[in-house]
């Protein structure tokens, strides 16, 4: 029988100080299946604290500008010294920081500098646990443009990890064939954990953070929202992409391809079951038709009208080509008989909207082109809409009854999957209204 394998990733709050690292030790040792541990850089210890990665990025900027950085370097070193002393272990911190200092003096590199938080944390945690340290520069493979090479990473991670009994892997970064360090975007340690889980064929990928699972709504907007016990990979990807910050959406994709369950847990409350992310609900589990609601502000809605744009003229394709040539991503595109609606982040439009509109007029000759700014985009998702077939309609009715203007609607087929545009000033009202509707089901 195959030995059970669990990959456990611990986020920044879970390694913020020595006390948190001791909690990691208790969690890891409570289940022998937790063989492979992925860690982030130390996060905030209190609300006004600064994350180590932010300190490192500031350090890089000062070095790049030729400004003195000794004080900033000492501050970062002190963070790690406090963790080491608190754990009562010996660790060559001076040597590690001499290497970092030399790199900053000779050739400052942003990704290399930013990655040193995860690198040092993983070495310290490995030392404390008595596990083998694995540097992802050996096994997380990027190309020279900073894009992940998934197939090569899978092979090299498998070869690096499986022969080991137990290991700690630094999250967030890897390297290209020349040895140059590249990082994922912020939150990328989640991706490292998911890649490791796939490489070793894990039975479970645990993501340990500072909340006991994923909330059905943003707790900064809704007071004491319900924790979701089960949700699908699709639901989590939608909610994560639209602003739910517990897990990086790309991490979900890797695990879902091999149907590895993801369990979001709380380092401070390990007794809580958290949220389980699965392909299909276990038999007998009943869940709310509306799994959750999340969203993002800072959107603009472009409305383009021309008679019979859907008659095979290629109007929509030409519009998307314009965006592609400008490397201008969009959140979604909705095509009607006589119109196209595009939702694009406002900050991406600010410097180019006049030129963009002029190109649209010259290329497509629309009857009308309009712009709505200061919009927000809200995702409402659920897998059980077949049991409440009017859920989509009732969500919209709830918003209308609250006097909330709806600027755009994009509705998926079958399951509950709504993307709704509302003015930014009513964003929080809309989130609360949808959550209130959810709780009434």
Language-model features, listed with the residues they occupy:
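A conserved regulatory-domain signal marking ACT and ACT-like small-molecule sensing domains
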Residues: 273-441
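Acidic/polar loop patches that form or flank catalytic/metal-binding clefts of enzymes
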Residues: 248, 259-266
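Terminal amphipathic helices with adjacent charged low-complexity linkers/tails
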Residues: 39-58, 264-281, 337, 342
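Structural motif
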Residues: 4-6, 34-37, 131-132, 165-168, ...
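Nucleotide/pyrophosphate-binding catalytic subdomain
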Residues: 1-248, 252, 345, 421-423
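Positions that flank functional sites
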Residues: 139-141, 212-213, 270, 338, ...
């Amino acid at each position: 029988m195959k030995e059970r394998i669990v990959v456990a990733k611990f986020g920044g709050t879970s390694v913020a100080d020595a006390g948190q690292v001791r909690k990691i030790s208790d969690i890891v040792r409570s289940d022998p299946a937790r063989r492979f541990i992925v860690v982030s850089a130390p996060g905030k210890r209190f609300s006004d604290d600064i994350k180590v990665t932010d300190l490192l990025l500031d350090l890089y900027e000062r070095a790049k500008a030729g400004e003195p950085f000794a004080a900033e370097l000492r501050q970062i070193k002190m963070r790690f010294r406090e963790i080491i002393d608190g754990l009562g272990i010996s660790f060559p911190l001076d040597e590690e920081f001499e290497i970092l200092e030399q790199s900053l003096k000779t050739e400052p590199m942003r990704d290399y500098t930013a990655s040193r938080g995860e690198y040092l944390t993983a070495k310290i945690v490995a030392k404390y646990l008595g596990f083998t340290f694995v540097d992802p520069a050996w096994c997380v493979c990027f190309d020279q443009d900073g894009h992940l090479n998934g197939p090569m990473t899978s092979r090299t991670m498998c070869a690096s990890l499986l022969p080991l009994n137990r290991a700690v892997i630094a999250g967030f970064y890897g390297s290209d064939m020349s040895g140059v360090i590249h990082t994922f975007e912020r939150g990328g340690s989640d991706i490292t954990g998911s890649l490791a889980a796939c490489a070793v064929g894990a039975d479970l990928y645990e993501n340990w953070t500072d909340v006991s699972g994923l909330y059905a709504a943003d707790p900064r907007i809704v007071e004491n929202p319900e924790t979701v016990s089960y949700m699908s990979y699709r639901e989590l990807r939608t909610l994560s992409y639209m602003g739910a910050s517990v897990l990086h959406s790309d991490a979900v994709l890797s695990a879902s391809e091999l149907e590895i369950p993801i369990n979001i847990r709380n380092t401070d409350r390990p007794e809580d079951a958290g949220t389980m992310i699965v392909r299909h609900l276990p038999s007998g589990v009943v869940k709310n038709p509306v799994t959750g609601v999340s969203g993002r502000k800072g959107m603009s809605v472009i409305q383009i009208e021309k008679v019979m744009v859907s008659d095979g003229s290629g109007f929509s394709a030409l519009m998307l080509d314009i965006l592609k040539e400008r490397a201008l991503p969009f959140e979604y595109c909705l095509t009607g008989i006589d119109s196209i609606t595009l939702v694009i982040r406002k900050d991406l439009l600010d410097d180019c909207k006049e030129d963009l509109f002029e190109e649209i007029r010259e290329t497509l000759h629309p009857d009308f082109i309009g712009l709505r700014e200061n919009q927000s985009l809200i995702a409402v998702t659920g897998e059980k809409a077949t049991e409440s077939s009017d859920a989509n309609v009732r969500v919209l009715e709830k918003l209308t009854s609250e006097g909330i203007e709806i600027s755009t609607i994009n509705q998926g087929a079958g399951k509950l999957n709504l993307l709704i545009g509302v003015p930014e000033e009513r964003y929080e009202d809309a989130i609360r209204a949808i959550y209130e509707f959810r709780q009434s089901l």
